[in-house]
Amino acid sequence: MADDPQEVAEHERIFKRFDANGDGKISSSELGETLKTLGSVTPEEIQRMMAEIDTDGDGFISFEEFTVFARANRGLVKDVAKIF
């Protein structure tokens, strides 16, 4: 199935919002800082999210990992997109 260009663009936009330093990957600190703008988040919640999304275990969320997560959690991503 071909990727929907509009969906890919939305994922890129959200990913870039989390990737504060623009290095092409999201660190746990970048994830935490961005999530804090959405409300209260604990270090444990950040670690759980990292563990779920960072499937290769390198300590960072790549765009590919983010896209897989976004496709599996479309409702959540739509809510985040509205805020950003």
Swiss-Prot record:
Positions annotated to bind Ca(2+) 2: D54, D56, D58, E65
Task: Tell me which residues make up the EF-hand domain.
Answer: 6-40, 41-76
Extract the CDD domains matched here. Answer: EFh
Q: Which InterPro entries match?
A: EF-hand-dom_pair (IPR011992), EF_Hand_1_Ca_BS (IPR018247), EF_hand_dom (IPR002048), EF_hand_pair_protein_CML-like (IPR039647)
The protein's matches in SMART domains, at most eight in alphabetical order, are given as: EFh (SM00054)
Per the record, its GO cellular-component terms are: endomembrane system; membrane
Q: Where is the protein situated, by its record's location annotation? A: Endomembrane system
Q: In which tissues is it expressed?
A: Expressed exclusively in mature pollen.
Name this protein carries in UniProt: Polcalcin Ole e 3
Native organism? Olea europaea
Give the gene symbol: OLE3
